[in-house]
Amino acid sequence: MTVHGNTKTSPMVTLLAGGVSGVIAKSTIAPLERVKILYQVKSKMYSFNSVYGLMKNIIKNEGLAGLWKGNTATILRIFPYSAIQWTSYDYLKNNFVTDKKSSVQIFIAGSLGFSCAILLTYPLDVIRARLALSYSNNNNNNSINSKNLNSSTQPPKVLKNGIGAVNIEKSIDFNGYKTKGLFKGIWRGILPTLYGSIPYAGVGYSSFEYFKRIAPDSFRNEKGDVIGIYKLISGGVAGGLGQTAAYPLDVVRRRIQTTGYGDGKGVENLKHSTLKTMFTIFQKEGIYALFKGISINYIKVIPTNGVAFLTYETLCDYFNSKLNKN
């Protein structure tokens, strides 16, 4: 049993609340996530006007569902991922953290819980990235501005679930698994992902707990609990801090995951270690490339993390109240 507030919460509740909160949060910002992935694997700079143009042309070429291409794979991954993440974090926090006010201990619990979720669900993240990268005009040019999306090429049929008529088997890369080994197939990019999970989850969880701890009375109810709007905002800010700390590793991860897929075929193969890949990107494209897409990422961080933190705690409170009545 874990403890949520002053109420004991069973692992089944944390699993369900964690999974549902992740699905709701990720589905809300799926269009921005797809655009971010497209920019991360390109060498061209962008502006908010080009982001708008890219989204408009995706809708034109693939329909509105094109903005959610890859979201079905995201949902299949995010439910178990978020469920494991929250349950692992709660278990570690309530069984191994001796001082709930210790940001260092919360940092470690958050990082370990996040890493557990990554290890168990990583292949689905690779598939999602490759599906999102595949978009309708098969243009090998590295530029992704709106002009290059205005193609006369007949766009592929987009399925109702938003994935698009793509070769799922190719995205999974069974042949790569057989011929290249575990870490070069569907596990490509796992190491930078794990490296990035340490600052991302550690900073995110420790910041959120700190913000809740220092919440003024004006943001607490009569029971002394932090109110929803404060959780929403503090969760978003905490997520933004974590993303900033981990973002260069996220860019490296996406480059490694998508090398040779979709429009990523035009990008130089990155088969080195994480640090060498990061240095290669920095050397060829500059420091900006390691933070490519971070501004659009900030736009989605507040709703994603805010909704996730708020939804998770709200669902835990709801399920606990129902169980206590029985």
Swiss-Prot record:
The keyword Membrane applies. It is a multi-pass membrane protein. One of its GO terms (molecular function) is coenzyme A transmembrane transporter activity. InterPro entries: Mit_carrier, Mitochondrial_sb/sol_carrier, Mt_carrier_dom_sf. It holds the Pfam family Mito_carr. The keyword Transmembrane helix applies. Keywords: Membrane, Mitochondrion, Mitochondrion inner membrane, Repeat, Transmembrane, Transmembrane helix, Transport. The chain crosses the membrane at residues 12-32, 64-84, 104-124, 185-205, 226-246, 290-310. Signal peptide: none annotated. PANTHER family: SOLUTE CARRIER FAMILY 25. Mitochondrial solute carriers shuttle metabolites, nucleotides, and cofactors through the mitochondrial inner membrane. May be involved in the accumulation of coenzyme A in the mitochondrial matrix. This is Mitochondrial substrate carrier family protein R. It comes from Dictyostelium discoideum (Social amoeba).
